[in-house]
């Protein structure tokens, strides 16, 4: 599952509103703000609250991806059938981040309304909490090796409850993810247009690069490809998208080497810039590796297919493209802090 860039909308709103609000803010601080100026400041504050709430939902979305991965690894060990399979190796870490629950609760109590996202978040909250409770109980059970004394009796009981909870969790989080992805797509299109119009060429090129990267992942989704079937996909579609990524990559590299423009837009963290460039290059390479494996029909090996970790770290798999992209998102967010 891909991640959404948390800081894109935040930068867009504050910068675009701030242009008209800087003088008004000065007047307000002097105690001389007119009614119109006060209205502008109130609008900026309202937009800021909206962005903060949206970014909390982005964090929730990203954390759901981590939860999904842990659930998959549990089922790889214990099975997803009614009868639990005895876990022979170390039990997979099942920790569910408390901040996910806290962010949902904070957003649901917010005065800012986002009807579609709020409804989906409210529906999924009890199942996230249930999965968290069960995951912690199972982790404690396996770490304490209680299965030695009860011959997996408690393991079976928790596994049965976990299967039911995950079913509801998957149904409700799916609705939330779809709502987030729809909103994120709209936000990115709007932001790219505004960045270009305002002459913010660093932000424009970064946002466009991220959009093209996401288009590549969207095609993986559209073709329903994973480690088990990706060599059967339409490779020509990916070549077209790879060419667009490569062309924009050259423009992004140029703008990130433009010290004057970087300084003008507030990009002064050279370490963050270098880290983003490295991950951006790695992502471009991961798309090339996927295309190469598709063209040479190098199918997924049994170890890659049976274990999600190996699928993610093996070059040229859809799962690897996703993993590297998620790391690009992390560096993109760090760059825009």
Region locations from a protein language model:
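Sec-dependent signal peptide recognition
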Residues: 2-8
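C-terminal motif of bacterial Sec signal peptides marking the signal peptidase cleavage site
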Residues: 13-16
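Bacterial signal peptide processing site
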Residues: 18-20
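Immediate post-signal-peptide N-terminus of mature secreted/exported proteins
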Residues: 25-87, 156, 160, 167, ...
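Post-signal peptide N-terminal segment of secreted/secretory-pathway proteins
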Residues: 69-150
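Acidic/His-rich structured neighborhood in mature extracellular/periplasmic domains
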Residues: 117, 122-195
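Extended amphipathic alpha-helical interaction segments
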Residues: 159-280
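A cross-kingdom marker for long, charged
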Residues: 239-337
